[in-house]
Amino acid sequence: MASTSDFKNGLVLQIEGQLWTITEFQHVKPGKGPAFVRTKLKNVLSGKVVDKTFNAGVKVDTATVDRRDMTYLYHDGTDYIFMDGDTYDQISISEATVGDGARFMLENMAVQVATHEDVPLFVELPVTVELVVQHTDPGLQGDRSTGGTKPATLETGAEINVPLFINTGDKLKVDSRDGNYLGRVNS
C-alpha cells in the first residue's frame, strides 16, 4: 500500500486487478475543497494511457516489481533477447513489452528489465544513449524553412530531428524516453 504522497514516476499500482505505472503526477491544492493528485497512468500490459485523479492521502495497492540489470543481446523476429549478467540466463521479451525504447537499443547495451511475478513488464533504457548518425542530408547554410533542424537516421534505424550542423558519422547524445537530440559527443 502506498499513499498519494508516495507517488513518483515509475511506481507500479495495482488497480482493479490490472497493473498501471505512473508516468506523470501533480499534487493540486485548490483554493476551495480538499487537495488531490492528478495522474497519468499507463497500463503495463496494453500500453493504454488514462488520466486518473486521487484524493490526497488515499491508500492505493502497489505491485511488487523487481528490476534486474540485464544486457540486450539481439533481436529475433518479434522478440528481443536479454541476458542476466549475474546468472547468464537469457530471456525473450516481446516487441510490445519492450515498447518504443527498442528503436534506441544497441546490442550489448545495459538495460533494466522490470518483472512482476517473473513476468517481464517493461524495459528501461538509460536516459541518454550515444548513437552514430548513419545518414543525414547536408544542412544548407541559411536554410530556416525547417526551423533549423533536419531528419537524421541513427545506427539503430531510428529517425530523429537534429540541428543543421550535424553530419553523417557524428556521434550524438539522444534522450531515450522521447527521442530528442541532446548534443554531440566529443570524440
Swiss-Prot record:
Pathway: Protein biosynthesis; polypeptide chain elongation
GO molecular function: translation elongation factor activity
GO cellular component: cytoplasm
PROSITE patterns: EFP
Signal peptide: none
Task of the protein: Involved in peptide bond synthesis. Stimulates efficient translation and peptide-bond synthesis on native or reconstituted 70S ribosomes in vitro. Probably functions indirectly by altering the affinity of the ribosome for aminoacyl-tRNA, thus increasing their reactivity as acceptors for peptidyl transferase.
Family recorded in the similarity comment: Belongs to the elongation factor P family.
Name by which UniProt lists this protein: Elongation factor P
Protein source organism: Rhodococcus opacus (strain B4)
